[in-house]
């Protein structure tokens, strides 16, 4: 038996698939691909699958992964990739299968790219509203937690935010805490921009990578 890490992208309309539905989709694809999987024991056996870090609904992912256990060690990573790629939709392309080098529990940071297109007005006007938000002494936001709603200041987490302006859009790149210890969604920033500055825009959001506490790329 061996564990392999399947790397895939979650693009286009797939960003609106919940994590539960993604799990079911992946399980069906694995079954169709006839990969010799290891199943859990008990009354309801299931294929062993461990996703690195679920994506929020509405967000795309450039470098997502799921760990699976394979019964036959003779099957190669390349063969797993080819079989699974044939069984998944075009919006969930598999681009690599590797041996896991880092446990998902080590994930501590994530990088994101947001593209904001104003519904009305110009990108320059939207940039002015973003700058006004960032100039506030605090950016108060509310976040759902296991114990209820938490109220906190988002501004200390935006120190690595970079903004580039195009003719018709803004592109935001940012690093935020992610993982089991602390998870700050980039949607908190866009929600604050809309609520506190009255900005109206379309947002395309992509999680580009995951990292450990030392900022080493999750592999």
What annotation goes with each model-predicted range?
Residues 71-76, 119-121, 179:
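Helix N-cap motif at beta-to-alpha junctions
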Residues 62-113:
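Ordered, amphipathic secondary-structure segments that act as subunit-interaction surfaces
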Residues 101, 107-150:
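Extended, positively charged loop/linker patches that create polyanion-binding surfaces
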Residues 78-88, 125-134, 188-190:
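Short amphipathic alpha-helices in soluble, non-transmembrane regions
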Residues 4-9, 33, 66-68, 108-116:
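Short glycine-/aliphatic-rich beta-strand segments at the starts of folded cytosolic domains
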Residues 135-219:
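Core RNA-modification/binding signature centered on pseudouridine synthases
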Residues 38-68, 101-104:
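Short, charge-patterned binding micro-sites
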């Amino acid at each position: 038996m061996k564990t392999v890490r399947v790397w895939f992208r979650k693009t286009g309309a797939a960003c609106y698939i919940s994590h539960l539905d993604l799990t079911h989709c992946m399980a069906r694809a694995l079954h169709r691909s006839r990969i010799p999987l290891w199943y859990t024991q008990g009354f309801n056996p299931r294929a062993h699958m461990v996703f690195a870090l679920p994506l929020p609904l509405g967000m795309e992912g450039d470098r997502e992964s799921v760990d699976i256990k394979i019964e036959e060690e003779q099957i190669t990573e390349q063969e797993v990739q080819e079989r699974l790629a044939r069984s998944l939709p075009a919006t969930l392309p598999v681009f690599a299968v590797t041996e896991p080098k880092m446990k998902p529990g080590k994930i501590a940071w994530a990088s994101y790219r947001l593209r904001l297109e104003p519904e009305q007005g110009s990108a320059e006007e939207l940039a002015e509203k973003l700058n006004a938000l960032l100039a506030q002494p605090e950016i108060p936001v509310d976040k759902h937690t296991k114990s209820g709603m938490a109220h906190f200041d988002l501004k200390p987490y935006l120190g690595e935010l970079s903004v580039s302006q195009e003719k018709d859009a803004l592109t935001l790149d940012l690093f935020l805490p992610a993982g089991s210890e602390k998870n700050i969604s980039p949607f908190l920033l866009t929600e604050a921009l809309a609520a506190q500055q009255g900005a109206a825009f379309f947002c395309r959001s992509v999680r580009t990578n995951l990292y450990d506490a030392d900022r080493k790329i999750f592999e």
